[in-house]
């Protein structure tokens, strides 16, 4: 991913809020979307292979505003592009603002997005987070599985995917990689929208224990107060 380093987005101390989406232009709204599926500039991403952003309802059978997809969608979504078997967009996020928690083993990530395709064709999109150390060495990667034709019910649209896990100790950067793959037809109909990557704190073991104990006590108290299923018999 060395060629994408110029797109690194620093999560500075002032913006290192836990739970905040760190992907820039993850919703394809920064910039004008294409009205016919053609190539346009995609701000915030290092793009190869023709990946583009397209208006919902663009001519040519692209997803319409009423098709399956995010409820809070904007005007645009990502698409694979014209006459290309594979296209890619990469964004590199600097995790240095979280280094203390990450290196203490106290950080987890959430990766999510809406992925999809066209009609009964098998073109698809995938989203991957590749964690690297300060020297650029890959430590760990996690991907959202592509949405297949069956997942979409053979209809044009997008389906939500989500994954989370621990951020590896030593991680200083994360590459966010959006891949679009064409399997048939001339247009690469891998689609994606509302992509998100966020960092959260790992709950302390004591917090889980206290929560579990509280739930057990609540259940015990509830059982003690529960009346008999047959009701009480009045005294003779």
Map each language-model feature to its residues:
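Aromatic (Trp/Tyr/Phe) and Gly/Pro-enriched flexible surface segments
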Residues: 16-116, 124-133, 138-169, 173-200
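Short, threonine-centered small-residue motifs that mark membrane-proximal processing/anchoring sites
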Residues: 2, 7-20, 195-215
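Activation segment
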Residues: 32, 212, 219-220
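Residue-level micro-sites within transmembrane alpha helices that shape
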Residues: 90, 203, 222-223
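Long, contiguous interaction/targeting segments characteristic
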Residues: 1-2, 42
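C-terminal membrane-anchoring or membrane-association module
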Residues: 219-236
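Extracytoplasmic/lumenal soluble domains of exported proteins with redox or metal-associated functions
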Residues: 5, 138-145, 231-236
